[in-house]
Amino acid sequence: MSLAELQAIAADWTPQLLAAAGYTLKMTAVAYIIGAVAGLLLALARLSQRRVISLPALVYIEFIRGTPTLTQLFLVYFSLALVGIVLPAFEAAVIALGLHYAAYMAETYRAGIEAIHRGQHEAAQAIGMTRAETMRYIILPQSLRVILPPMGNSAISLMKDTSVASLISAPELMLRAHDLTSEYYMPMQLYLIVGAMYLIMTYPLSMAVRHLERMAGKGRLSGRRR
């Protein structure tokens, strides 16, 4: 293959792969927001003393964690269509991925909340704060040190899991690579490039997570010294 042919291929691949990478990042961001908000609500429900609230949250979390992501994506995309709700691929993917990661984020939130000493709950109630005020002003701010590193890891995993959306024809990075492979018959080169693009997108998040873990470790160490 001549240099001119390689340049022509690169000129065709580059804009398509960059557009697909942008789509992947957008999908990741929207699904992450859905997961973070829904996960917090699930965690609060899971911690409720009322079983009518905590039990459905537990069942949902166990169902999501016990079934494949792809199954959940197909349930959202195809099952809703059976009742007349036809979602575009992007909306179906971000809803399915967001609700999937909500279950994992709920457990992250719960672990962070439960890491705060029970005495702080009791002290807040002693000065007249409601349960909601205690959670908002006392517990959640302190639990961030525990919550943020695994939440960052969830963002990395979510970005990689967007590849399943290619199976419902969402034009993300893996689908675009598959289409280009069918056109150019160069699978090894394309998938190596796509793998490198995923690494470039996730590496800054990995560095941020490591920094948060170091900060959390220093916080725990200074707390023990006191």
Residue ranges and their predicted role:
Residues 1-226:
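Transmembrane alpha-helices and adjacent helix-loop boundaries
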